[in-house]
Amino acid sequence: DLRVTRPGFLEGIKHLKEKEGTKDYNPNTMASRQEMRTFVCAQCHVEYYCGPKAVLFYPWHNGLKVEEIEKYYDSYKFKDGHRFFDFKHKITGAEVIKAQHPEFELYSQGVHAKSGVACADCHMPYVREGATKVTDHYIRSPLLNVNRACLQCHHFTESEMLDRVSIIQDRNFKLQNSAESAVVDLINKIAKAKELGASEEQLVDVFEFQRKSQWRADFINAENSMGFHAPQEAARILAESID
C-alpha cells in the first residue's frame, strides 16, 4: 500500500483539508489510492519553508494558489515577531519570498488534476511485466515516453502531442521572460531611487510591489513544468507579476 510519512506534508495537507471543510484529515486512512498516487510525490515536489527561523512547514493554510500561499506568508510571524521572508534583496533591501519547486500546487490548478489524473499516471505510467500491470519506476518526463504516458488518454499522434506541449511551453517561456524582465526593471528603478536619496519609508509600498512581483515570477520559474501543469494559471500568475 502507498503511504505518506513526511511530517511537513501531513501537517500541510491537514490544514488544507480543514480549510476545505474536512477536520483531522489523515491521507493514509482517508485518501483514495488515486489521490495517494499524487500525495506520495507532493511530500517533496511542493512549496515549503525550511530554514533556521522555524520548523519546516508547508504554507497551505489558505489554499494552494499563489496568492493564497502569499497571504499565509504575509500573516506568518517568526519567533522574533518579524513577518515571513526568505531573504532581503541585496540591491533593494526588500523582504522577498523565494519559491522552492511548487509542482503540486500548480498541477492542482490544471486540467489534469481536475480530471483526476495523478502524478504517477504521466510520470510513472503502467507497464506490463508478464501478466502483471505495474507502474514504471523509471521516473522521468512524459515527453520521453509519450506513447504510454500520453496516448493512453489522448488519441493523437506522438508528434502532435509533442507539438502541443512545445507550443504551451514556448508561450509560457516568453511570458516568463517578460515577467522576469519587469522584475529586473523594477529592481533597477528602486536602486536608482535609493541612489537619488529615497528613504526606506518612502519605498515601503514599492518594496511590496517587488515582493509580490518577484514571488509570482519565481513561482513559475521554479515550478519545473514550464507552465504545462496548468497553462492558464501560469499565464495568470505571470501576467500579475508583470502588472
Question: Predicted segment positions?
Answer:
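Primarily the internal scaffold of c-type cytochrome electron-transfer domains
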Residues: D1-D121, P125-D243
